[in-house]
């Protein structure tokens, strides 16, 4: 059975109630590829608003940009899995490079958050990727494997069915630089091989591996043709009308 194409829009720390409502209403009214799963991730303040607008047409799901690994307590500024459940938010992004680099989140901490989310019934867009220095040192596969291994220590084999892996080379995020189709496919194929060896052949066959890093309406169609590219995690372009073209990359 073919893997369902997946496109996520990470709004990051952008948007207002008005602009986020407009973006989702535009998606509600647009002609979208019905075979593509679409998820948008607004800032936490607007999650319930986004959910209400998305519920009007049920074409788009909503994701948090982050979640904490503890169930509740004195963790100022954090969001718990149970709070996402209560707000009926089905997805969360975990491990984005901006949190790894700026907020110093470790592989182990990120893995605990992935486990907490999945244990609580929240599906995860699990971000991994290397820096420019690591790529130039030919350590890309070593780095992403280390990030994956941390999660593998926390999850059961069955729980990988709730994970979408987002390969996002750090050097391509927000820079305008994009991994070539060959570079993206090489890493995606290595991740799929890791899934087969470390988790199970079923996980390798069924887990969606998406690409992120300056994805635009100009490069999405070529990337979407690659065998192991199952979709995209889109940053800045998800705030623009061109997001529809990226969702429809396989039409």
Swiss-Prot record:
EC number(s) from the headed UniProt entry = 5.3.1.1
Q: Which UniProt keywords apply?
A: Gluconeogenesis, Glycolysis, Isomerase
Gene Ontology CC annotations of this record: cytosol
Q: In which pathway does it act?
A: Carbohydrate biosynthesis; gluconeogenesis; Carbohydrate degradation; glycolysis; D-glyceraldehyde 3-phosphate from glycerone phosphate: step 1/1
Q: Name one GO molecular function term.
A: triose-phosphate isomerase activity
Identify the Pfam families for this entry.
TIM (PF00121)
- Catalytic function, reaction form: D-glyceraldehyde 3-phosphate = dihydroxyacetone phosphate
Q: Which domain of life is it from?
A: Eukaryota
Mention one GO biological process in which this protein takes part, according to its record.
glycerol catabolic process
- Class of enzymatic activity (EC top level): isomerase
- Catalytic residues at 96 (electrophile), 168 (proton acceptor)
Enumerate the residues binding substrate: 10, 12
Relate the assembly described in the record.
Homodimer.
Would you identify the family this protein belongs to, as annotated? Belongs to the triosephosphate isomerase family.
Q: What is this protein called?
A: Triosephosphate isomerase
As recorded in Swiss-Prot or TrEMBL, the protein's gene is named tpiA
């Amino acid at each position: 059975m073919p893997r369902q194409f997946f496109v996520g829009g990470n709004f990051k720390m952008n948007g207002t109630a008005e602009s986020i409502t407009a973006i989702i209403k535009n998606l509600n009214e647009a002609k979208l590829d019905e075979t593509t799963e679409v998820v948008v991730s607004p800032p936490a303040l607007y999650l319930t608003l986004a959910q209400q607008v998305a519920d009007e047409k049920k074409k788009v799901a909503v994701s948090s940009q982050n979640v904490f690994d503890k169930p509740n307590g004195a963790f100022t500024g954090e969001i718990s899995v149970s709070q996402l459940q209560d707000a009926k938010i089905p997805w969360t992004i975990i491990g984005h490079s901006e949190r790894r680099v700026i907020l110093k989140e470790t592989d182990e901490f990120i893995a605990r958050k992935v486990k907490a989310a999945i244990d609580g019934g929240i599906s995860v867009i699990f971000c991994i990727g290397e820096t420019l220095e690591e790529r130039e040192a030919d350590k890309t596969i070593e780095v992403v494997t280390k990030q994956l291994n941390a999660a593998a220590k926390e999850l059961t084999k069955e729980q990988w069915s709730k994970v979408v892996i987002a390969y996002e080379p750090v050097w391509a995020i927000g820079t305008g630089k994009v991994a070539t189709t060959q570079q993206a496919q090489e890493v995606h194929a290595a991740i799929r091989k890791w899934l087969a060896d470390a988790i199970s052949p079923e996980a390798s066959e069924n887990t969606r591996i998406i690409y992120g890093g300056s994805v635009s309406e100009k490069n999405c169609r070529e990337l979407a043709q690659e065998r192991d590219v199952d979709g995209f995690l889109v940053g800045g372009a998800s705030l623009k009308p061109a997001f529809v073209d990226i969702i429809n990359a396989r039409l």
